[in-house]
Amino acid sequence: MRKILEISGASTLAEVFPKFELYMHGGVNFEPYRGQFQALFPDQNIQFRNSYNASEGFFASQHHQDEVGMQLLLNNDVFFEFMPLDQLGKSTAKVHTIEEVNLQEDYALVISSSAGLWRYLIGDTLQFTSLYPH
């Protein structure tokens, strides 16, 4: 982004992108970078939204800036199952569907997708902060 300032001769990115309103981020904790990013857009009310995506699919997005949790994308060619962490490694592990999850319980994410993944344990864990919407 600093290269854009250098090339354009602008002092802020707001001069280059005056209608910039939304920044989607994901994969890393954005908080250490928020202040630097906001300094590039002074006096603009930028909305920041987190997303949960991976090579295996796009799983969730933050719908409201003031809420920490994200909402699962349940109509995106991915079927979600949730394995309680105490079940990991068990040959008869109990796996839950979206209707069977509990709040504040840690789950390992298991996905099946139209891309050919079947009951794939991707290595991520999550907790539900809301049961509706998920």
Across the structure, where does each feature detected by a protein language model lie?
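Active-site glycine/GP-rich loop and adjacent strand/helix microenvironment
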Residues: 1-134
